[in-house]
Amino acid sequence: FLSLIPHAINAVGVHAKHF
């Protein structure tokens, strides 16, 4: 589960960078 946390944060970072 802890491995999903950095993945989610990275996804949010990529999503924010996209906009």
UniProtKB/Swiss-Prot annotation:
Lineage: Eukaryota, Metazoa, Chordata, Craniata, Vertebrata
Any one annotated GO CC term: extracellular region
Location in or out of the cell: Secreted
Organism of provenance: Pithecopus azureus (Orange-legged monkey tree frog)
Family: Belongs to the frog skin active peptide (FSAP) family. Phylloseptin subfamily.
Name used for this protein in its record: Phylloseptin-Az5
Modified-residue entries (Phenylalanine amide), positions: 19
GO biological process: defense response
Tissue expression profile of the protein: Expressed by the skin glands.
Claim: Transcription regulation is one of the keywords in the record: no
Primary role: Has antimicrobial activity.
Keyword Kinase assigned: no
Top-level taxon of the source organism: Eukaryota
Key words of the record: Amidation, Amphibian defense peptide, Antimicrobial, Secreted
